[in-house]
Every structure is written in structure tokens, then in C-alpha cells.
Amino acid sequence: MSIKAEEISTLIKQQIQNYQSDIEVQDVGTVIQVGDGIARVHGLDNCMAGELVEFSNGVLGMAQNLEESNVGIVILGPFSEIREGDEVKRTGRIMEVPVGEELIGRIVNPLGQPVDGLGPILTSKTRPIESPAPGVMDRKSVHEPLQTGIKAIDALIPIGRGQRELIIGDRQTGKTSVAIDAILNQKDQDMICVYVAIGQKESTVRGVVETLRKHGALDYTIVVTASASQPAPLLYLAPYAGVTMAEEFMYNGKHVLVVYDDLSKQAAAYRELSLLLRRPPGREAFPGDVFYLHSRLLERAAKLSDAKGAGSITALPFVETQAGDISAYIPTNVISITDGQIFLQSDLFFSGVRPAINAGLSVSRVGGSAQIKAMKKVSGTLRLDLASYRELEAFAQFGSDLDQATQAKLNRGARTVEVLKQDLNKPLPVEKQVAILYALTKGYLDDIPVADIRRFEEEYYMYLDQNHKDLLDGIAKTGNLPADEDFKAAIEGFKRTFAPSN
């Protein structure tokens, strides 16, 4: 059988017609220097600020410095395998993280990858980690309470949904414990919580996760962790990843509580990156834009207007002080950005006042309008009582011959301090807080020995639960105080059954 030339030419023509040449154009650069989590790359002339790039070993990086001859890239992973001369590809994507309901109950790193060993997170939705904060007209003033379950905070320094409240203090003063209690108290409150651990020890993060799991709080919490062993770029990105996950819920009309533990370590990581990228250092060697680093993060916490779905993000950023110095650079920056601060003092902590909140230096600038009416009424004089007690306490150490009014103030102050103490991981419903503070401010505790106050409190709650549940339910439902005579009858009824210790 002979093959005809025409057949061959027809076959060749068909093959040529069917041939599709898929040309893939890639923007590729070359690593000219690498080390300490930073790579300088030549040849990525069209790279965008904040764009993700991919190294030849699959590790991702983020473009930070766009210079004339090279691009400064922070490496988001191990950099020991990256060598000079390696190829770097542009991805054309800005840094994004996965978002959505599927993340609830999971522990992820700042790139949104799971680190809890429970398999992949099945969500296709992502959001860019840098996005503009809601504008002025998209917001509404803070008016709904966020109950932390901590008497000292809910009474003296109330927090509203959509507020930014700084928690500031030295190391080992109970900052994390305050935030964990606030998360535990959001059970059945229709709140989603995001806990962002920045530069914490892995064992500490594990402890926090176990506490949340034990109390059933992991059912509504996302944990984002960039531990101390992670590269600095991941510590810098962690808070932005956390707030991005929270924004997805806020824009869908939900309420979110975000805890940043803590921003001092993020600022230190950002300082490290900036110095390695050869940006000019400023005060305490921080770069000039360290204020913007925190302001653009915390401005994304907001209470949205009804037209935008009325969702909210409440932010509890932490800042660690050195020897109680709240006038240092990062503390003053964050104090000026937030709507108030809760100052935890080591002297109080070691003297047994826990939570160790200094009522004089702590303030909530917008939370007062979010307090329920009942709490407003019973906590009105508390701050003054405490302040005058602290003043007189120092004075009373020198002289014993005190007049009756001064002695009464000291007695009331000692009982106030005792009532505001609270055990770890035992947040208290707001109606019970109101009940004990009512008894305190109306003078029903003045004849109870200070040593018996904690026992009195516990037995009082049990008595109310058994005999006057209607009073507690009334406060919880309406937010108002019951009639004075009803409350008076309940307290006096309990006091008749209470036996002080000898």
C-alpha cells in the first residue's frame, strides 16, 4: 500500500490547524540577597506593594520595599532553603486569608492554614488582609453593652460593642486572663470571638486553647497563632489576619470580639523587619509609621450603621509595659488610638487584688452609654468610693485617731475592694453583679466582716437563685432595677440566715 503525498500534506495541515500554543507569561525575578527573613529580588519591575510572590521552593513572600533596582520581600516561612540566584515569580495576588464560618473552632496561622491537625479548612472565600476601615457615615455610636463577666470592668470601665479598649500592664499581671474571661462570658450571647496570639510561647497558646475547650468556648472562637518561634513577618501579619476573619462576620450583621495578645510583640517584629529592610529608624528604633501600623488595625473595629447590617467588631488590644511605664512610645500611641484603657498593676496583683485593675488610671471613654440602667444606678458612686479609699488608706497608716466619717469611708472601701475581687475563669452574669453591687452601695455589707465578704457573696447568689429568681430574671430581661422594697426584702431575708464566722 503506497502512501500518497496529498494524504500526508492533508494530515500535516490538520495537525497544524488543531495545534494550540498555550503561552504562559510570567514575571520572574532573581534573588540577589537573602537572610534574616528578608530577600532582595532583581527583575520584578511591575510588582505591586503588598503582592504575594512565590520562591522556587514554594515558600511565599510579600513585597514590602519597591525600589528602583530591586524589591525588598519579607519571607512568610522558612528561608534556609532560599539561595542567591533562585527564581521568584509574581502571583498577581495581594495577601489574602480564608474567611467564613468554617474557621470557627479552628486554630490557624496568619496565612489561614490550620495548625490544629484537624484537616483542611473547606472554605473557598477569601478577603485581602489590608482593607479600608468603615467610613464615618457607615458607623453608629456604641450603644450595646458587651458584658465581660468581670465585676470591676462591667461596673467601673464598661465596654460596648464596637469599642476599642486597651488592656495594659506589666507581664504577669493577668492581662490574658481578663480577655479569656471576657471570651468565656460570650457563651449564648450570639458573639463570635477571635483570639490572636502574637509571639506567645506555644505552651501558653496550648493552655489558652485547652481553657476555651474545657468551658465550651471553642464552639464560637477562632484562634490565630504566630508563636515566638515563627518568623517576624508572620508576627507582623497575625493581627491583620485576625481582624480580616472578623470583618467577614461583621459585614454579615454579626457581632465579633477580637483579642490581640499582644501588640508590643507585633511592634517589635515590625521594627525588626523595617530595620532589615533599611528603613530609617525613629524613636526607640521604631520606624516612622509604627503609629499607622496600629491605627489602621484598630480603626477596623467599629459598630456599623443599620444600613450596613448593624454588625460590630470590638477590639481588646494588649500592650505590655516595662515597670508600669505607660508613658513609653507604644503604650502612648495605642492609648491615643483606643476608646479607653484598663490598667493592670503588679502591686495590686501581688497584694491579692485580682483582677488587678487600677480604677484611677483606667477609663472607658464611650462605654458608659452602653451600660444597662441597673448597672449605671448601682455603680454610680463606686469609682469615687474607691478613689477616696485609696487616698485615705495611705493617710490612715500614719494616724489611728480617725473621725467617724473617715472610718466609715475606709470600711466601705475595704468591702468594695473585696467585692470587686473575682476568681479566674468564673465570669458572672450581669444580674448577679447588679445584685451584689446594690447590697454594697446601699450599705448592707457594712456590718459584715471583711473576711466573710466572699463567702457572703457566694451564699447570697445561691439564696437569690433559690428564692428570688424573679428579681434576677427581671434585671436580665429589662435591664432595670427591681423595686427597692423587693430588693431590700431579699437582702434582709438572706442576712437573717447568714452566719458570720467568729
UniProtKB/Swiss-Prot annotation:
Membrane topology per record: Peripheral membrane protein
Entry keywords, A to Z: ATP synthesis, ATP-binding, Cell membrane, CF(1), Hydrogen ion transport, Ion transport, Membrane, Nucleotide-binding, Translocase, Transport
Compartments in which it is found: Cell membrane; Membrane raft
Catalytic activity: ATP + H2O + 4 H(+)(in) = ADP + phosphate + 5 H(+)(out)
GO molecular function, one term: ADP binding
One term under GO cellular component: plasma membrane
InterPro entries given in the database record: ATP_synth_asu-like_sf, ATP_synth_asu_C, ATP_synth_asu_C_sf, ATP_synth_F1_a_nt-bd_dom, ATP_synth_F1_asu, ATPase_a/bsu_AS, ATPase_F1/V1/A1_a/bsu_N, ATPase_F1/V1/A1_a/bsu_N_sf
Disulfides per UniProt: none
PROSITE patterns the UniProt entry points to: ATPASE_ALPHA_BETA
Site positions for Required for activity: S362
EC number(s) recorded for this UniProt protein: 7.1.2.2
Binding-site positions, ATP: G169, D170, R171, Q172, T173, G174, K175, T176
NCBIfam families attached to this UniProt entry: atpA, PRK13343.1
Assembly description: F-type ATPases have 2 components, CF(1) - the catalytic core - and CF(0) - the membrane proton channel. CF(1) has five subunits: alpha(3), beta(3), gamma(1), delta(1), epsilon(1). CF(0) has three main subunits: a(1), b(2) and c(9-12). The alpha and beta chains form an alternating ring which encloses part of the gamma chain. CF(1) is attached to CF(0) by a central stalk formed by the gamma and epsilon chains, while a peripheral stalk is formed by the delta and b chains. The F(1)F(0) complex interacts with SpoIIIJ and YqjG; YqgA is found in the same complex.
Protein name from the UniProt record: ATP synthase subunit alpha
Organism: Bacillus subtilis (strain 168)
